[in-house]
């Protein structure tokens, strides 16, 4: 259901102008193909002699289906989900890393690709790490191949005549497929570099990467000249990216995923010359139940081992503890092995079932922690104590991150200073005793454990825990098998600290022993492995997720275990492997299209009585930042040719979309996000049909999972609402801006309904402010109370004439919406509203808060549970009072997504668990967190006084809280408690006379409040409107952070009010906002609304 728009560069055949209606139906533009419903688009274009780019898509799908049927015929099975993705890349001629778990057919795919290419007369080389694999592959290939396919292999133990046969065919290029070992690549570098292969498959990239010169050899084997490799390497050494010559068309290089991280910079040659990085399988797909047992009881351990019986790893904190456990369990006749003296032998015995239990030591790089991938055997992981990092707190030995944090907090070093550890220790000794230092650490590092007697800081090693527990749950034959992790931990502080970090990093929770049903868990563990052994239908799929922001794509891919990244034209694509297959993440980097500026009515054509918006790709000058839509090679402002054109982004998305089985557009959950979603969807529909929309309200694993459960198509009411807003902005903005520019002779001036209305408030408030100056006196009473009284007070006493006391329950404020967040955070932290909005955007995209553009105060049950969990953690569950606040609103209020406070986040930044958060981010997060927790806490019971006093013959009322009777939400948002009054006369200790304006000037915060109150603007535009007023020079901020109009701003507003008042009145602006809201809800026809807008500004246009 298209929305009657035209898009430049969207025709799938000529790349020209097409309608969204034709794109939705998969049709090229009318110039290429006037027909409305051809039975065969390719043939119709061919017959009209207008066939262009559509040939590529037609041939792509034909080639892919040919590969698929060939594979099925030869191998007897259809492609798996992983293999479908790889096949589509092969057909497109792309090099890549095969990132996938074991048992999904990587080697089979490499062989079948070589055989398929051989049919086309193309040459392939298959490289394996061992002679055994070379032999096995040769045998399999010869069984599968047709007689005409020439296959030769080489290994050292071959017969003499076979070697000679290989060498002859190799020298004469008389072969289709060659199979040899990594060692052969190293020894025959010169010969191989002279050959040109269409396809090179490397089965064990780790073995190849051991000798960095092998990388050059592989690149030359696919046709990249040595001179280009040298140039590329030289560029990479300078920290730059090498741009491969456009005329260079190399063959395809496919490598298996690495197990170790590639070292050095030479592997970056793959990135710059073949557009892929050597990825590692870092699957975070896990299905683990974590259980905590709150005592280190060996009897309990024995009881548990008798339930589990087999497939058990035990991690002790030290080798001594491990030996003690080993000897203890031997006494109970358990079949147990250790890993500190005979790792290889005992591990092999464990592998084949001769040993049931294996004991190792907790260590991040330990062999048992990282070097083991045996999900068929490892089912249960037991930790004898929490994996921890221990740091001395002696002033001579304390670690740098602890010293720096303490000294910065005390103001002894500046935030930007970076002294070395010895200098830090020296400063600490000069200003702190050992006892004071430990007390400071306790006060500041709340989420860790400080042992006074040992002067030791203990931080749970969450990454070691995640790595080691993950041995029990992996993808096995396409099935994510179940695992159980048990932690024996007595120390409550250490356990809570681990629990918090596990929730942040892996989004996994730990249950207590009482909640665990061991019998049921054992059944789930065994059943998942039985399922992996059965002959199952392959359910793996490839999925492409398109978001707006590269940060969001990066955050999501990291949560799901990013395995590799690559560049596709001008965008980055991240790849992750999950239990259901491969997920690709990429970003549009904001809007991809905008209204053209020339033609029609400011970019909107009128056809058959209907308005048709015309869009072109957005272009942005990388040098000066100017944005435009015209098709031109240089910036219209600074003439730079360094242009970022979203046409490239769209083309890249079309190419990537061909790889995936399913595409989900996950742009922001608002009207702007919906419009971007439609812009992308209509562009991709001609080349792929499996395309839907999801909304993510938080960037977490949970948020992603929940969004996947509510897949839908684009909401056209939201798209239409965005079009109406944009067209209204364009029409009124262009017309009024043109009048201003002409009147004042300045080309950078702008006007708009909301912008000009708000400017009017500021101008008028300035006038009211100037007229409102009055005398005031500040009285400081002997009981410590300050009273502000209008007028000049002569008396030296204040008499209490009436006094009442009452108990009252005070309820909390609701959680933040966009307007209340911008207003309060801007005010409290003295930040501009645009800066606050940018910080909120960062916190959302990095997965710390829910979506930040919202008018709703609603809190979901999941949100309420975040509050309950945190209150339980700090021992305050008794004050939990779950409130939904509202049942309305597509979004929730702004809230934290995890029960982790700002102090804990700060500690995790110091530990390196979190990156890219500044002090400002933490302060904003703290305000959001506290406001949210307050909103979910019980009412505060207070005692208040209602007092009437006589001052200079005038009576004034005072109401104040004098006592907190029962704590509640005030633990997060403190209340002011004032000194009590008694029924008597109080001396005035001090008087201060001053003049004060009774009408306050606006601040950025109060402008946003006013916009919300008067129904002007929207959550997504509040900050932007304020920012535009500053940028245009209409307003400025004085030293008290008050917003005031410039002389020029007053002139602009006076001119608009005098000449064009009806277009910029508050009433007109509010009425239009209401109409646009109705379009969003589907209650108003959007074409009729555009007609109404047009008729309203027609006279303005005709004025000239």
Swiss-Prot record:
Topoisomerase I: region residues: 538-1104
Cofactor: Zn(2+); Mg(2+)
Region described as Latch region: 390-460
Binding-site residues, Zn(2+) 1: 11, 14, 29, 32
GO biological-process terms attached to the record: DNA topological change
Binding site for ADP: 75, 78, 83, 103, 105-108
Textual note on the cofactor: Binds 2 zinc ions per subunit.
UniProt KW keywords: ATP-binding, Cytoplasm, DNA-binding, Isomerase, Magnesium, Metal-binding, Nucleotide-binding, Repeat, Topoisomerase, Zinc, Zinc-finger
Chain positions of motif DEAD box: 203-206
Family per record: In the N-terminal section; belongs to the DEAD box helicase family. DDVD subfamily. In the C-terminal section; belongs to the type IA topoisomerase family.
Subunit architecture: Monomer.
Name used for this protein in its record: Reverse gyrase
Organism: Thermotoga maritima (strain ATCC 43589 / DSM 3109 / JCM 10099 / NBRC 100826 / MSB8)
Lineage: Bacteria, Thermotogati, Thermotogota, Thermotogae, Thermotogales
Gene giving rise to this polypeptide: rgy
């Amino acid at each position: 259901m298209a929305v009657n728009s035209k898009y430049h560069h969207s025709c799938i055949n000529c790349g020209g102008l097409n309608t969204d209606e034709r794109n939705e139906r998969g049709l090229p533009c009318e110039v290429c193909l006037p027909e409305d419903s051809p039975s065969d688009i390719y043939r119709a274009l061919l017959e009209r002699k207008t066939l262009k780019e559509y040939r590529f898509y037609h041939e792509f799908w034909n080639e892919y289906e040919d590969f698929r049927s060939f594979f099925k015929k030869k191998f007897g099975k259809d492609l798996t989900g992983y293999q479908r993705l790889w096949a589509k890349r092969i057909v497109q001629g792309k090099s890549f890393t095969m990132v996938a778990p074991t048992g999904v057919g990587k080697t089979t795919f490499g062989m079948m690709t070589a055989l398929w290419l051989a049919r086309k007369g193309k040459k392939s080389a298959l490289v394996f790490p061992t002679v055994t694999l070379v032999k096995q592959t040769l045998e399999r290939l010869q069984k599968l191949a047709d007689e005409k396919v020439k296959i030769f292999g080489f290994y050292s133990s071959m017969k003499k005549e076979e070697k000679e046969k290989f060498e002859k065919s190799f020298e004469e290029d008389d072969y289709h497929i060659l199979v040899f070992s990594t060692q052969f690549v190293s020894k025959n570098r010169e010969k191989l570099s002279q050959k040109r292969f269409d396809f090179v498959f490397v089965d064990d990239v780790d073995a190849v990467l051991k000798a960095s010169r092998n990388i050059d050899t592989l690149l030359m084997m696919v046709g990249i000249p040595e001179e280009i490799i040298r140039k590329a390497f030289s560029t990479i050494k300078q920290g730059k990216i090498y741009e491969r010559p456009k005329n260079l068309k190399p063959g395809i290089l496919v490598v298996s995923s690495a197990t170790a991280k590639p070292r050095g910079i030479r592997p970056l040659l793959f990135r710059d010359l073949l557009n892929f990085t050597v990825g590692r399988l870092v699957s975070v797909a896990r299905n683990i139940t974590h259980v905590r047992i709150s005592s280190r009881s060996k009897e309990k351990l024995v009881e548990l081992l008798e339930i589990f019986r087999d497939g058990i790893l035990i991690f002790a904190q030290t080798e001594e503890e491990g030996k003690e456990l080993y000897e203890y369990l031997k006494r109970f006749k358990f079949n147990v092995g250790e890993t500190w003296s005979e790792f290889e032998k005992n591990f092999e015995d464990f592998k084949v079932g001769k040993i049931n239990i294996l004991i190792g030591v907790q260590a991040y790089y330990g062999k048992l922690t990282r070097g083991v991938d045996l999900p068929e055997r490892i089912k249960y992981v037991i930790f004898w104590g929490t994996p921890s990092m221990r740091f001395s707190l002696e002033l001579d030995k304390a670690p740098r991150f602890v010293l720096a944090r303490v000294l910065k907090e005390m103001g002894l070093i500046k935030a930007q200073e970076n002294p070395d550890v010895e200098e830090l220790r020296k400063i600490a000794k000069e200003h702190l005793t050992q006892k004071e230092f430990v007390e400071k650490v306790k006060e500041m590092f709340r989420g860790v454990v400080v042992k006074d007697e040992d002067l030791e800081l203990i931080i749970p090693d969450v990454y070691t825990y995640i790595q080691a527990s993950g041995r029990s749950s992996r993808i096995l034959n396409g099935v994510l098998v179940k695992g159980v992790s048990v932690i024996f931990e007595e120390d409550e502080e250490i356990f809570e600290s681990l629990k918090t970090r596990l929730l942040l990093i892996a989004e996994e929770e730990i249950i207590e022993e009482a909640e665990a049903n061991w019998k049921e868990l054992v059944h789930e563990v065994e059943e998942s492995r039985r399922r992996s052994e059965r002959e199952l239908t392959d359910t793996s799929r490839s999925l492409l997720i398109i978001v707006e922001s590269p940060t969001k794509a990066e955050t999501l891919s990291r949560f799901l275990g990013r395995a590799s990244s690559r560049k596709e034209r001008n965008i980055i694509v991240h790849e992750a492997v999950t239990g259901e297959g491969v997920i690709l993440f990429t970003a549009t980097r904001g809007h991809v299209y905008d209204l053209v500026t020339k033609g029609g009515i400011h970019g909107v054509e009128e056809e058959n009585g209907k308005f048709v918006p015309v869009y072109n790709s957005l272009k942005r000058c990388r040098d000066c930042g100017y944005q435009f839509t015209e098709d031109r090679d240089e910036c219209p402002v600074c003439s730079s040719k360094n242009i970022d054109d979203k046409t490239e982004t769209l083309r890249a998305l079309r190419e990537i979309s061909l790889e995936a089985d399913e595409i989900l557009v996950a742009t922001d959950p608002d009207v702007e996000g919906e419009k971007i979603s439609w812009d992308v969807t209509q562009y991709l529909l001609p080349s792929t049909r499996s395309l839907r929309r999801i909304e993510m309200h938080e960037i977490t694993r949970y948020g992603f999972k929940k969004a996947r459960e509510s897949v839908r198509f684009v909401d056209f009411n939201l798209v239409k609402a965005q079009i109406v807003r944009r067209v209204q902005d364009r029409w009124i903005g262009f017309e009024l801006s043109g009048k201003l520019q002409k009147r004042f002779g300045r080309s950078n001036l702008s006007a708009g309904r909301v912008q000009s209305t708000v400017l009017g408030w500021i101008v008028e408030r300035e006038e009211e402010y100037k007229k409102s100056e009055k005398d005031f006196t500040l009285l400081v009473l002997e009981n410590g109370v300050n009273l502000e009284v209008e007028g000049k007070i002569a008396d030296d006493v204040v008499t209490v004439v009436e006094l009442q006391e009452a108990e009252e329950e005070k309820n909390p404020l609701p959680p933040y919406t966009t307007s209340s967040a911008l207003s309060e955070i801007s005010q409290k932290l003295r930040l501009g509203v645009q800066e606050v909005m940018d910080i909120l955007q960062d916190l959302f995209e990095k997965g710390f808060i829910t979506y930040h553009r919202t008018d709703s105060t609603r809190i979901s049950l999941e949100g309420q549970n975040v509050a309950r969990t945190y209150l339980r953690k700090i021992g305050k569950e008794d004050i939990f009072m779950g409130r939904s606040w509202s049942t309305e609103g597509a979004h929730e209020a702004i809230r934290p997504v995890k029960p982790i406070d700002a102090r804990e986040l700060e500690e995790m930044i110091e530990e390196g668990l979190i990156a890219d958060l500044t002090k400002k981010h933490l302060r904003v997060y703290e305000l959001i967190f506290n406001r949210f927790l307050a909103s979910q806490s019980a009412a505060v019971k207070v005692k208040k006084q209602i007092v009437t006093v006589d001052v200079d013959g005038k009576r004034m009322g005072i109401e104040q809280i004098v006592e907190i009777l029962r704590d509640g939400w005030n633990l997060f948002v403190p209340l002011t408690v004032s000194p009590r009054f008694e029924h008597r006369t109080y001396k005035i200790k001090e008087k201060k006379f001053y003049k004060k304006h009774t009408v306050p000037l606006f601040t950025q915060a109060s402008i946003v409040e006013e916009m919300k109150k008067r129904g002007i603007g929207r959550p997504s535009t509040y900050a932007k409107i304020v920012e535009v007023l500053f940028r245009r020079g209409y307003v400025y901020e004085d030293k008290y952070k008050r917003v005031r109009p410039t002389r020029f701003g007053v002139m602009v507003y006076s001119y608009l009010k005098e000449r064009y008042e009806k277009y910029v009145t508050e009433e007109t602006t509010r009425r239009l906002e209401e109409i646009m809201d109705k379009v969003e809800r589907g209650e108003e026809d959007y074409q009729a609304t555009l007609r109404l807008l047009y008729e309203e500004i027609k006279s303005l246009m005709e004025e000239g």
